[in-house]
Amino acid sequence: TVMNNIPLVFWLIPIASVVALGMAWFFFRSMMKEEEGTDRMKEIAEHVRKGAMAYLKQQYKVVAIVFVVLAIVFAFMAYVLKVQNPWVPFAFLTGGLFSGLAGFFGMKTATYASARTANGARTGLDKGLKIAFRSGAVMGLVVVGLGLLDIAIWFIVLNAVYQGESTALVTITTTMLTFGMGASTQALFARVGGGIYTKAADVGADLVGKVEANIPEDDPRNPATIADNVGDNVGDVAGMGADLYESYCGSILSTAALGATAFAMNGDMQLRAVIAPMIIAAIGIFLSLIGIFMVRTREGATMKELLHSLGLGTNVSACLIAVATFVILYMLGIENWLGLSFSVISGLVAGVVIGQATEYYTSHSYVPTQKIAEASQTGPATVIIKGIGTGMISTMIPVVTISVAIMLSYFCANGFDMSLSAKSISTGLYGIGIAAVGMLSTLGITLATDAYGPIADNAGGNAEMSGLGKEVRERTDALDALGNTTAATGKGFAIGSAALTALALLASYIEEIKIAMIRAVENGKQYIDSAGNVFDPSNASTIDFIEFFQVNLINPKVLVGAFLGAMAAFLFCGLTMGAVGRAAESMVQEVRRQFREIKGILEGKATPDYGRCVEISTRSAQREMILPSLLAIIIPIVVGLVLGVAGVLGLLTGGLAAGFTLAVFMSNSGGAWDNAKKMIEEGHYGGKGSENHKATIVGDTVGDPFKDTSGPSLNILIKLMSMVSIVMAGLTIAFL
């Protein structure tokens, strides 16, 4: 009996993942049955689809090479140097494969859905909303379905292998944690590559089209429009999906590892603590589906009503999971189930608060963005100053929220035990992990609202280029404006969840170090602590490790690590900004060349060469993403080898603090500039084509790489540095 120790309730996990994938397939089929519209609409959708698929193909080629190289490195570390778990090379590959699949399915759906959404909007607003939202739901469900499936399969396999060993669960969870490396690497390329692609096209299209040639957005005369629309899919669907896939898996796996440690003394409780985060995620899938079916609206709905219908689905799912958590943890019989349930709720609430705060600072219904639009009366410089100021101030609420969530989830979990005993710390850390899982448990629907944005955006582009009637444009505009708000709150949510996940990963880093040291001791190594006694890693607590490695602020290694972490965040940002700048320059030159050399583009008589622009974006993105990506992987390895465990913990703390605040600042500045421009386009302060409008276009163009490249890429950086440290723990220990 291989499965005799797995409780029956565990099977909810694979069942939920299969249900999610089944429903995703159902939504995909029902979307494909809808009409795609006129021949012109079909033709434009085909252009975008080809471009998106060409990009994915190219990107996956590069990623495949990187994966093969890394898998060989891991295999060498595991089988030759024996400093790595032997399962890692395989787990790493499945993590990457599943994440890549999720991106592929999400993107395929989005590119098929845009024309159908535009066509649906010809009949009515509700029809358009449903097609776009349910197509977005395909992405959300595929991510949670594949993520949980990967986790469930590996848990069953490893459990069968290690069953009966005294440290079985610690070994299983620390092994599973390293698959996160596959999801992380995939996410890095999808987010950074996608971010560079989409903004090279967007900035190029805006600068030449709107500012120089005075043609509106999404005009078929602009050669970069198709690339711009492809970019929405590449960055916001595939990139966002891979980012949240990584947070989702990372939070569940690190929490399982923390649970194995927190309850190590009690075998039965330990197993329950390990599968608890997986079960919360599984129940979250069922509850997300309820929310997805609740999203609908009426004709002529106002923006407020539209937002309400999307918000209703998300909030109902969140409230249901809050209630369900109490039931799940009580039925699992986990000690202090009540406190842990409040940990989950603190994560859920933090997600909502950060989303709302993001909306406040970036939506033009509120003062901060209105003030930026007002500043356009004195030219672009004041618009930039105001936007940067707004972004910086906007970091306060998310940072305070995450801080409160950390404190609450930690102390609720350990029953407000202020003593720093080993038990209270490990239980508290488990609580923080559980909060991250809570925040991400309704990912099925929150990601659906995110992926909805680019689908609606592309539908608007399609309607504009196909020359559909005015009332259709008004409907797609309403859907698109809604999409921009959900995209902003979605970004806030992605950043918040990345921060909590990174924190849980940071906490589980010590577990990986512990396992690595036990492995080294088995191979005949002996550790002596500062007092000259033999240090035995196998029954040492988290505190003992912190003392053994002298992880405190008086240790210069920790301080230097923290400085390097903060610097890494800025360096990474700078590199991605520079990459967008360079890629946009080559795009601008290409668009100018076409206007010069292809006669009759501006009169609408000749068709521009869209393919060239798509190619430029694809090539730049591939070339430019290598350096920042390598940096993220190399820095933690070098710090581990030079400064040891203390240095790495400093690096991860500094990187998390700087990366989180920087990401919020960049995301919100960019979002506010974008919406200030939209506010003027709606007719305030002089309207379209005025000098004020041009000033806000400058702001929006600066904001593009802020909010869509550098900001979101930081989510990956803070998780990836923790992930790399975890995977390289064995190497760090070998050089002790």
What does each model-found stretch correspond to?
Residues 2-736:
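Hydrophobic packing and interface segments
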